[in-house]
Amino acid sequence: MVNTVEVFEYSNKPDDVLFNVRFSQVAVNKGNYILKNSAAISRIYEYIEPVNGIPQGNYEPVIQLIAPIKTQVATFLGKYNPTEKTAIDFEIGVSNNDKNLFSSQDDSNNEGLATKINAKQRLFSKKWNVDAFANYQFIAKDFSSVERLYSIEFSRDWNLGTTAIGNQSYLVSGLQMTLPEKGSLVYQFEKLDFSGNFSGNRHILNALFNLNHWKIQSQGSFLNSDATSSTSKFLRNQTQVKYHFKKNWIGTRLRLEDNQEKNKTTNEFSALSQRFSEYGFFAGRGDSTKVFVELGYFKRANDSLQNGIIQRVNNSQTFALRSKLIQTNKSDLSLFVNYRVLDFVDATKKNEPSLNSRMIYNDRFFNQLIQSTTVFETNSGSIPQQEFTYLEVPVGQGVYTWND
């Protein structure tokens, strides 16, 4: 007891009356406990007396109750092909997301609407097929989906962060040129707007060609965005050229990123800003779907924010081995090895060599009734110690489960 207030104190004495207490983090000056020691196996919390009736901590010995929720989504689909060269389809979705079935407060924003329309028109059909396409999506701010609407990289593609709010409008349009059995070239213009605080556009150019013994792949994009507090430009490209002859191949690869985000008020780069470029060569022999071996060499330059300027931090050289040594109906053996030397621009830092490898062996017995997998890994270099905190969310909304 502290001034007639019952408090909990950490103790490991077996003679004391012990309680299993769980603490939850609350807002600053809303709790009476602070986190005193997080290095121990069990976190230690300390009671701090209020000052003039104002709590001085940000933890409380309470467990938040999770209210039952309900999410419903109804969709209506349609399709119309006025001619052989024209295709139109649409989708309308309505959602009802009640975050607390025990309460009627704030029920006015439970319902939301989303629409999507696609159109494609064949412009030219001879040696080359040329198609124009457009896709428009509108998602009201209160619309809730059961599953993820976009890829996990969507936010990074647009430098959205966690600030995008309001109704969403997303337009995709472009041209696709296809050379039958040879390849295709696609140009896209994308426009994304959030009514609250974001507007951006992206230019995308993708190519894939198989010409005689040559295989060419390229993916490139350029983003220009304007948010409430920042602007950004984001350039990316990944290109690979490979030449096949008999059971052998040689190739080269280029990857680069240049992401520059600036604060509107200070005109300074944000911590998101970074840049890298990587190029290399590789050669292999065999069948990449069966037994093969491939050797590669790659050189990379990394630039990051230093003293308010994006500048060179380190360079690296990587020697890589990819292989599948055994491939049968009953077993397969794969081996991957990477040796990297990291060279820092800062002369006070030593070069960091690292060797990482993985060998995977799969075997199947009794007509695949029994299957076994053996994995052997080696790692060198240092990995910083990390601590993770997990918060319980309603069933179906998390990606981790409690297992003890």
Model segments located where?
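Surface-exposed, low-hydrophobicity segments enriched in Gly/Pro/acidic/Ser residues
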Residues: 1-404
